């Protein structure tokens, strides 16, 4: 498969810069195999589910993972010895004091450089600023930052000095503000660790969750900490050559047992978002049994993949040539998704993290 197979024209004004208010008033496109697409709103979701269905959410919580600061001057002097403004997006925690991050400008950074994030008048290690050393440097602007703080103290420092890591297509249009601290977080988020929101979940309100439970739909929570790699474009012309960044996920024994029981009783597994789906697929064997999982996953789903768990997927509208558009094409069929996206663009649906949503029923013929 070629990357161009997943391209389409998306007008720039279709990318939402703010979420719908209230959250569940966003538009909702229902896509069933062999049927015409249907326009609804997210609050209609209970109408498409049955008692006994199991809804699976990702309860990760977004941390303010975008840090701005200065690379301190080097003793060598010269142009490279002067301080340089830098920006880091934390990607994955490696140790109590270490994070993998994407950092720019990458060409101005070397192993051993000191970086001061936040205020620049504090002492090293003081919460007045956040200090780190570049311990490793890799391709694509990825570095390992060794902070002077560790554990809970580092968490506090990041919370004080970091900004919410809005996706590039939104950040290019406007800066992060205080509204995003609430808007870019699901109402059920509880496990700190993501640098991007599981955006399908942003549409849920406490009232909608109660209506789902009243319908007899069970609610289950798994955790996948979404990394900054979710923002990276595919750079290979041949799709199979692309490599995903690993992300940590967890499915408990209790959740695995509950999902297996729901399926055995005839209920459908409904994944809220691609992160929930990717994690469940990683935790499920070829026999279709969900098992406890606590590990990293770099699963990359493209057309031809045989799904083991999910029957229905709720997901936002994704960007051209993205790994997520490849995933939904694998789930609901490439031609069906092209037709659905053409309809969405023509009728004014809003795309991407703060945009509208869709409900996809799996096409078993894919």
Curated annotation (Swiss-Prot):
DNA damage recorded as keyword: no
Subcellular location: Cytoplasm
Recorded coiled-coil stretches: none
One GO molecular-function entry: S-adenosylmethionine:tRNA ribosyltransferase-isomerase activity
Any one of the GO CC terms: cytoplasm
Gene3D superfamilies, alphabetized: QueA-like
Catalytically driven reaction(s): 7-aminomethyl-7-carbaguanosine(34) in tRNA + S-adenosyl-L-methionine = epoxyqueuosine(34) in tRNA + adenine + L-methionine + 2 H(+)
Keyword Transferase annotated: yes
Keywords: Cytoplasm, Queuosine biosynthesis, S-adenosyl-L-methionine, Transferase
Example GO biological process: tRNA wobble guanine modification
EC number: 2.4.99.17
Annotated metabolic or biological route of this protein: tRNA modification; tRNA-queuosine biosynthesis
Pfam families: Queuosine_synth
InterPro entries: QueA, QueA_dom1, QueA_dom2, QueA_sf
Domain of life of the organism encoding this protein: Bacteria
Complex formation: Monomer.
NCBIfam families noted in UniProt: PRK00147.1, queA
Function of the protein: Transfers and isomerizes the ribose moiety from AdoMet to the 7-aminomethyl group of 7-deazaguanine (preQ1-tRNA) to give epoxyqueuosine (oQ-tRNA).
Entry-linked PANTHER family: S-ADENOSYLMETHIONINE:TRNA RIBOSYLTRANSFERASE-ISOMERASE
Record-stated family: Belongs to the QueA family.
HAMAP family cross-referenced by the UniProt entry: QueA (MF_00113)
Protein's name according to its UniProt entry: S-adenosylmethionine:tRNA ribosyltransferase-isomerase
Lineage, broadest ranks: Bacteria, Pseudomonadati, Pseudomonadota, Alphaproteobacteria, Caulobacterales
Underlying gene: queA
């Amino acid at each position: 498969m070629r990357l161009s197979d997943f391209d389409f024209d998306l007008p720039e004004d279709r990318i939402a810069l703010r979420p719908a208010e209230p959250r569940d008033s966003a538009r909702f496109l229902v896509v069933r195999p062999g049927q015409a697409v249907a326009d609804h709103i997210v609050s209609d979701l209970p109408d498409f589910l049955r008692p006994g269905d199991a809804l699976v959410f990702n309860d990760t919580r977004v941390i303010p993972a975008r840090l701005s600061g200065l690379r301190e001057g080097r003793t060598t002097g010269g142009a490279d010895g002067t301080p340089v403004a830098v920006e880091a997006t934390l990607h994955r925690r490696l140790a109590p004091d270490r994070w993998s991050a994407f950092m720019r400008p990458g060409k101005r950074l070397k192993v051993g450089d000191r970086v001061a994030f936040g205020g620049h008048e504090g002492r090293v290690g003081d919460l007045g600023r956040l200090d780190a050393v570049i311990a490793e440097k890799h391709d694509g602007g990825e570095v390992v930052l060794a902070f002077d703080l560790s554990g809970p103290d580092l968490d506090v420092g990041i919370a004080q000095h970091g900004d919410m890591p809005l996706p590039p297509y939104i950040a290019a249009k406007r800066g992060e503000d205080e509204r995003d601290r609430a808007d870019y977080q699901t109402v059920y988020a509880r496990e700190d660790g993501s640098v991007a929101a599981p955006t399908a979940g942003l549409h849920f309100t406490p009232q909608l969750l109660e209506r789902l439970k009243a319908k007899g739909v069970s609610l289950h929570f798994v955790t996948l900490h979404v990394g900054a790699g979710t923002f990276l474009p595919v750079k290979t012309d041949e799709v199979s050559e692309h490599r995903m960044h690993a992300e940590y996920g967890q499915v408990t024994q209790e959740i695995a047992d509950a999902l297996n029981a729901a399926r055995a009783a005839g209920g459908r597994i409904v994944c809220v978002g691609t992160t929930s789906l990717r994690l469940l697929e990683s935790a499920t064997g070829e026999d279709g049994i969900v098992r406890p999982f606590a590990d990293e996953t770099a699963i990359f789903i493209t057309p031809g993949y045989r799904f083991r768990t999910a029957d229905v997927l709720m997901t936002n509208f994704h960007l051209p040539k993205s790994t997520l558009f490849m995933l939904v094409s694998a789930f609901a069929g490439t031609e069906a998704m092209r037709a659905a996206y053409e309809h969405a663009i023509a009728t004014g649906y809003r795309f991407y993290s703060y945009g509208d949503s869709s409900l996809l029923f799996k096409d078993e013929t894919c």
